[in-house]
């Protein structure tokens, strides 16, 4: 397949909102040789997940702590395939924010575009684990998540333009100033190949479905790849049937439309190809990170220029591996792990 090519505090190498205007000149002159393979933009937080399955939160005895947030998880997943990755986001000026930075550095993700916001807390997310398909999430993002404070003037538009993959999620469109920052970033990309929108719609982050549909529609005018499940496609283009949804996304101008269908697998369409790949069947422990694992592997396959069917099989397998593990970000597989699973599937 070929796709047409507030006052804040500085922590580590994170930029603060107070300093953003001062450093803007240097931030918009990222040298080509420093370009990233993947830049994601959007949610970050700390996942506090149970270490017992089938138990409600009030009865859980032990928890694990890991970095979370869909856009951040995708950057982590892509870094597992030895790509140069970075995430554009914001944390609180608090211990969890400092943890996020240290953990991302440990996991090989650049924190160059992360700043902390005074007066707001780093988001925390709890979940319950009831395999195979019930994983209630409890988001603590009030009064406002720092990652929704990304501003236009803070963006390194040169880096965003130069990166091979620019990945965003629709949550970043839910509130200002993040909403406008995302639209400016899309305009800077100017429909460059591999400008990807994850249709990751979460109703609790939006004032109404109608507002979400409007903002996603604006974004679709600028992206070249759209990825979502049937429910997310309904918000984006008013269709739940996978084929009609993919066609509607293509009509909006994207070059590659991917519709995830859960146990029925995944459908992908371009102007010239229609590919359906069955689900990679696993014993699910926690399915919450599988979509982000799919996303990071999708970035990898597209960067490598693989045929579309191989990209989808690899991404499906990666997502399946994540679903067999308790956590999300630290559950992302390596290329060798994914290839081993694919090889094993050939002999089943």
Label each PLM-derived region with a short phrase.
Residues 7, 19-39, 187, 238-348:
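Conserved phosphate-binding/catalytic region of the ribokinase-like
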Residues 18-110, 283-285, 348:
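Glycine-rich phosphate/adenosyl-contacting loop at the front of the ribokinase-like
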Residues 76, 124-128, 265-268:
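Short beta-strand scaffold segments in enzyme catalytic cores
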Residues 84-168, 195, 339-348:
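Conserved N-terminal subdomain of the carbohydrate kinase-like
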Residues 165-248, 263-266:
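Conserved beta-alpha-beta core of the PfkB/ribokinase-like small-molecule kinase fold
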